[in-house]
């Protein structure tokens, strides 16, 4: 829900002057909410919420207020939208559901764990009478029965975690991607070569798609030796061998460069460590030369008795 940043229209200002008053809003809801909805609402808990869901460029046509309240089913909201324009919006039902979902989203972002009930209410003041359109958003579809069935049922789910690998192998052009995404978190993807190679040999994927999959394995997966994995795959799938060998060579080069960098870094760290030790020994030597007792020197420098024994006065 966003803050309003345009100058209020006379419609908007007047509407808000009244409907932002809880007592007036309570009267409005007692008068106009359907009985079955009014029965689930505790109107004594009405609380005005800040902001607006109406887009800035539409404020001359619409105004809205949002109230939170307690319902018999937990937290809830009543969103009142008033239409100022003379010609009614035939997609108003869809607008109402969009704003209701936006209110639900804001509720979740505030840290709540469950979706709230949001009751949209349209306050129509246009010239055309009576209001000519349905406020049931599903009626905006060509096939309302099918839309009702779709949006009131569980959505389709593809849970790859429960599909057997043998079944996945028969999924044609989706097989390789599905298999890899199912096992991407396993300990070592190199164990998948025996299953992956026959799928790639089936010829459903182009070389660019195979390369994309291998990069995905290297970047997102776990394998003890990525280069060896890719070389093995190149031998098993000769039609993509050149492309895969190119990747293997790139991985080999990266490994060499990483080894060089690691060696250089270790050399730097070793040199730094040796330099710090030499400086500490020098400080200890000076302290001993100034007749500071050995226990104090060891405590202040962290050196041991053996370290001090190496110091020549």
UniProtKB/Swiss-Prot annotation:
InterPro entries xref list: Rpn/YhgA-like_nuclease, RpnA, Transposase_31
Record keywords: DNA recombination, Endonuclease, Hydrolase, Magnesium, Nuclease, Plasmid
UniProt GO MF annotations: double-stranded DNA endonuclease activity
Enzyme nomenclature, EC number: 3.1.21.-
GO biological process: DNA recombination
Family: Belongs to the Rpn/YhgA-like nuclease family.
Function in brief: A low activity DNA endonuclease probably yielding 3'-hydroxyl ends. Involved in RecA-independent recombination and horizontal gene transfer.
Protein name: Recombination-promoting nuclease pSLT051
Record organism: Salmonella typhimurium (strain LT2 / SGSC1412 / ATCC 700720)
């Amino acid at each position: 829900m966003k803050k309003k940043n345009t100058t209020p229209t006379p419609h908007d200002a007047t509407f808000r002057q009244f409907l932002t008053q809880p007592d007036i809003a309570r009267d409005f809801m007692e008068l106009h909410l359907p009985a079955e909805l009014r029965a689930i609402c505790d109107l004594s808990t009405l609380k005005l919420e800040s902001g607006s869901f109406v887009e800035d460029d539409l404020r001359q046509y619409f105004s809205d207020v949002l109230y939170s309240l307690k319902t018999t089913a937990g937290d809830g909201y009543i969103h009142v939208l008033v239409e100022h324009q003379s010609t009614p919006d035939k997609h108003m039902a869809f607008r109402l559901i969009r704003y209701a979902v936006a209110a639900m989203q804001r509720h979740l972002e505030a840290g709540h764990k469950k979706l709230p009930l949001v009751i949209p209410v349209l306050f129509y003041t246009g010239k055309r009478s009576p209001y000519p359109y349905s406020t049931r958003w599903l009626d905006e579809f060509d096939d309302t029965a099918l839309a009702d069935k779709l949006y009131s049922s569980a959505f389709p789910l593809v849970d790859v975690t429960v599909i057997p690998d043998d079944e996945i192998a028969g999924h044609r052009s989706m097989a390789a991607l599905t298999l890899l995404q199912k096992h991407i978190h396993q300990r070592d993807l190199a164990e998948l070569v025996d299953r992956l190679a026959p799928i790639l040999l089936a010829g459903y994927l182009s070389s660019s798609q195979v390369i994309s999959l291998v990069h995905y394995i290297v970047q997102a997966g776990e394998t003890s030796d990525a280069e060896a994995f890719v070389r093995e795959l190149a031998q098993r799938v000769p039609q993509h061998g050149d492309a895969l060998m190119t990747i293997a060579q790139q991985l080999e080069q990266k490994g060499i460069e990483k080894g060089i960098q690691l060696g250089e870094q270790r050399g730097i760290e070793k040199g730094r460590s040796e330099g710090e030790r030499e400086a500490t020994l020098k400080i200890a030597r000076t302290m001993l030369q100034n007749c500071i007792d050995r226990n104090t020197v060891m405590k202040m420098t962290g050196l041991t008795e053996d370290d001090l024994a190496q110091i020549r006065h």
